[in-house]
């Protein structure tokens, strides 16, 4: 191989595997890319501590936070853990540069278990056409229940059935489709408000026009 700082001129040595002991020494920390990294989690904890949430109470607050989570990152959080408002924890995620969804994903299992024990299914299932028998499949971070690298639950709960997983997949695809339709409609409305459609010349004044609804 080339010496340090010298240009490589021959690739032969780089087509060989390392020695067995060297290869075995190469390890990674098991983690999920949907959950916060250790560094991200520490940033959130420290940001929350500056607002009055002690590190000792962080896990409990994060579970309540996840139980309070709705459909999107723009959810309006109304709950509290003791006196600490969940809205403040959402803002601390923002301060730390970590999406709210990541924190909720990480604490899904205990939050899900607590909701199951209290028989409080996610409110979304009633207005999202989710079959009653699969109402728990509408849980916002349902995928985390199948992720071995997130925080486990001390309270037992029923594992998702294959049917629940299938319903959740359909549910997610339907929500993505609806979101795309809403974004398209909002974009069209914004263009109309400005007096023109994308790619079209500005409309002249004092005229009456029929604008066909988006397909």
UniProtKB/Swiss-Prot annotation:
Pfam families hit by this protein: Flexi_CP (PF00286)
InterPro entries in the cross-refs: Pltvir_coat
Assigned GO CC terms: helical viral capsid; ribonucleoprotein complex
Assigned keywords, A-Z: Capsid protein, Helical capsid protein, Ribonucleoprotein, Virion
Domain of life, per lineage: Viruses
A molecular-function term among this protein's GO annotations: structural molecule activity
UniProt biased composition (Polar residues): 24-34
Parts of the chain that traverse the membrane: none
Primary location recorded for the protein, binned into one broad class: virion
Biased composition (Basic and acidic residues): 12-23
Region (Disordered): 1-34
Protein family: Belongs to the potexvirus capsid protein family.
Function: Required for genome encapsidation. Forms ribonucleoprotein complexes along with TGB1 helicase and viral RNA.
Protein name: Coat protein
Native source species: Foxtail mosaic virus
